[in-house]
């Protein structure tokens, strides 16, 4: 649900509804996007990046743990940009959020929603590999394996970089589950692409 009067404010991101019989809760920690991929309307429909403060997210995580939830999935329209909207003096990152959730008693598993390849750095992967509650499952947006198409899509990575990021995850996490999404038939894409 989007209320246009709230677009651009943290209030646009609502706490999720949860039911007692479930063990997995989805927590939306971020909304909006600043990427402006050529095929995507999200920056226009949802606005720019807005992140929930860690303290606010933690209130929800603690409440979920108290209700018996064992697993949380941190989600967002552009999860990798979590925190980029905060002023420098109030900087919070996705990694700092993950670490905070990891400390919550009762939460046994943490998953992440879809990530952009750019967030997968050696430091990021080493850090999450050191957190036993992190599930080794990552959805990395690919969209196309063709660099020309990626450029036309206004994606900010190329296929070799994407493969390198997958390699980093495998290096530090052994055999993680990797999933992706691919757009087929993008305008001007050829059979060779």
Named regions from a protein language model:
Residues 11, 33, 37-40, 57, ...:
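Hydrophobic packing within well-folded, soluble alpha/beta domains
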Residues 12, 26-28, 41, 73, ...:
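Conserved beta-strand segments that form the floor/walls of ligand-binding pockets within enzyme
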Residues 10, 14-22:
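His/Asp/Glu-rich metal-coordinating catalytic cores
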């Amino acid at each position: 649900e989007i209320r246009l009067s709230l677009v651009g404010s943290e209030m646009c991101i609502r706490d999720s509804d949860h039911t007692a019989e479930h063990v997995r809760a989805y927590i939306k920690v971020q909304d909006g996007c600043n990427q402006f991929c050529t095929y995507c309307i999200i920056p226009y429909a949802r606005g720019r990046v807005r992140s929930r403060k860690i303290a606010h997210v933690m209130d929800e995580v603690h409440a979920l743990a108290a209700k018996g939830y064992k697993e949380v999935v941190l989600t967002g329209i552009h999860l990798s940009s979590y925190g980029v909207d905060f002023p420098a003096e109030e900087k919070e990152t996705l990694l700092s959020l993950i670490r905070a959730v990891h400390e919550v008693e009762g939460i046994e598993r943490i998953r992440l929603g879809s990530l952009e390849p750019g967030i997968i750095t050696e430091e990021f992967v080493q850090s999450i590999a050191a957190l036993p509650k992190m599930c080794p499952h990552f959805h990395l947006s690919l969209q196309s394996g063709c660099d020309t198409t990626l450029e036309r899509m206004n994606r900010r990575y190329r296929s070799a970089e994407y493969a390198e990021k997958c390699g980093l995850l495998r290096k530090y996490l052994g055999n993680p589950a990797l999933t992706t999404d691919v757009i087929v038939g993008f305008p001007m894409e050829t059979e060779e692409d």
